Amino acid sequence: MHLDQLLQNIPAKIYGKVESIPVRNLTRDSRCVGVGDIFIARQGQFCNGNDYSSQAVANGAIAVLSSLYNPFLSVVQIIAEDPIALEASLAARFYNNPSRHLDVIGITGTNGKTTVSCLVRELMERSGRRTGLIGTIEHILGENRIIDSFTTPDAILLQKYFAEMVKQNLSAAVMEVSSIGMALGRVRETEFLAGVLTNITSDHLDFHGSLEEYIAAKKQFFASLPEKGIAVVNLDCEYAPSFLNGSQARAVSYAIHQEADYRADRLKLYSSGSSYDIWYQGQVFPCETSLIGEHNVYNVLASLAVVHQFLGRDFADLVRDVRFLSAPKGRLDPILLGPFPVYIDYAHTPDALDNVCRILLQLLPKDGRLIIVFGCGGDRDRVKRPLMAKVSEHYGFSFVTSDNPRTEDPDQIIADICKGFSTDHYVVESDRKLAIEKAISMASDKDIVLVAGKGHEGYQIFKHQTIVFDDREVVCEALAALC
């Protein structure tokens, strides 16, 4: 695409001569700018892109998008009152509005986004629809798989990923929609046909400031759904009705404890999975799955509801496919290589940790203990740190350690966590590898060890470096050392 085409009729003031020259790329990183690129100079959380505009021009940028005019730049300047919205608009135009050529399903909520996204994709694929995935664990763009540190990629990358899906002849996409991604405009210009709300509990208050603002960010997503779209909500979540009030999409509900379009009852939860009945339009459909725990009953209900409404496939056939679904990596991931089971889970909020611990408590042999290794991420919601301790203390013995400290002092994060303990049933070990090893050394054959917080992640982030670190590998090595 050429610069004059890209900038045609955009809501911005243009300074400089706009020529018909090829645009190679859009980028927000001045270090990645090459000849023919447009540099997006945005105010970020930790730095201001305007400080790097000159470097971007020196590297070959042919235009700069900003909210501030810089008289010292020699290239075209695109000055917008809302550069976040314009960035998304330019990205969509540059990649030929790829989401219009895909049936896009968005999944939002505090917990369960990753599992529901993966289950929806599996059900879509089993129904004959080639479906991409944008999510926490990975992005699946057809034959290409990409690991990214963001649940919801920035607007430019997102449109690029959608374009790759279209290029590879995919017809649908499922993506996790985070509250931060909504607030930062990452999904603007993405045309969704369906949305799912999993649940709402307190999270990301460091970014949003309050629970009300956090909920408001997620409501934006449902408000953006078209009239022909589908809004699927969990009626056991007290905030669900307010999400429907602001949406013009067709409402669809699921629940366990409330009357809903799709409702599960007669739950039987086992160490190897679960079975239950699903009620839909007065009929009962028996469901069996290898997914463990009540929270996964919700995840299956959400996935079935949106895929059934989306595709109109026979519901009995769809329910039968559930038996073939598997949990994503790092979600109640069992390691059964020693005298006791060890579970890896991504739980990093009080609610998620409570759900996982409650499930594992049901699997404990008589006189067994639940031993929990956990920490909290740095530069993230500090309010939840002592709450995590309260949850862990309620269910078992705790090893408090580092998660991803990022720019914070790991010992200070641990001190914040420990304020939530009311007993001395915990040990502090800031080295995560040592904490896991000590927990496994402490366990007996009647115990269960839970390593929580990082799940699928293969790294650990510190202030000055990111190291290779995989909870599963550490657990396997520690169990092997017992033999």
Swiss-Prot record:
Compartments where found: Cytoplasm
Catalytic activity: UDP-N-acetyl-alpha-D-muramoyl-L-alanyl-D-glutamate + meso-2,6-diaminopimelate + ATP = UDP-N-acetyl-alpha-D-muramoyl-L-alanyl-gamma-D-glutamyl-meso-2,6-diaminopimelate + ADP + phosphate + H(+)
Main location: cytoplasm
Modified sites of kind N6-carboxylysine: K218
Gene Ontology biological-process entries: cell division; cell wall organization; peptidoglycan biosynthetic process; regulation of cell shape
E.C. number: 6.3.2.13
Keywords carried by this UniProt record: ATP-binding, Cell cycle, Cell division, Cell shape, Cell wall biogenesis/degradation, Cytoplasm, Ligase, Magnesium, Nucleotide-binding, Peptidoglycan synthesis
Origin superkingdom: Bacteria
Gene Ontology cellular-component annotations: cytoplasm
Cofactor(s) annotated in UniProt: Mg(2+)
PTM annotation, UniProt: Carboxylation is probably crucial for Mg(2+) binding and, consequently, for the gamma-phosphate positioning of ATP.
GO MF assignments: ATP binding; magnesium ion binding; UDP-N-acetylmuramoylalanyl-D-glutamate-2,6-diaminopimelate ligase activity
Ligand binding (meso-2,6-diaminopimelate): R380, D403, N404, P405, R406, G453, E457
Residues reported in the UniProt entry to bind UDP-N-acetyl-alpha-D-muramoyl-L-alanyl-D-glutamate: S30, T151, T152, S178, R186
InterPro entries to which the protein is assigned, alphabetical: Mur-like_cat_sf, Mur_ligase_C, Mur_ligase_C_dom_sf, Mur_ligase_cen, MurE/MurF_N, UDP-N-AcMur-Glu-dNH2Pim_ligase
Family to which the UniProt record says this protein belongs: Belongs to the MurCDEF family. MurE subfamily.
Name of this chain's protein: UDP-N-acetylmuramoyl-L-alanyl-D-glutamate--2,6-diaminopimelate ligase
Gene: murE
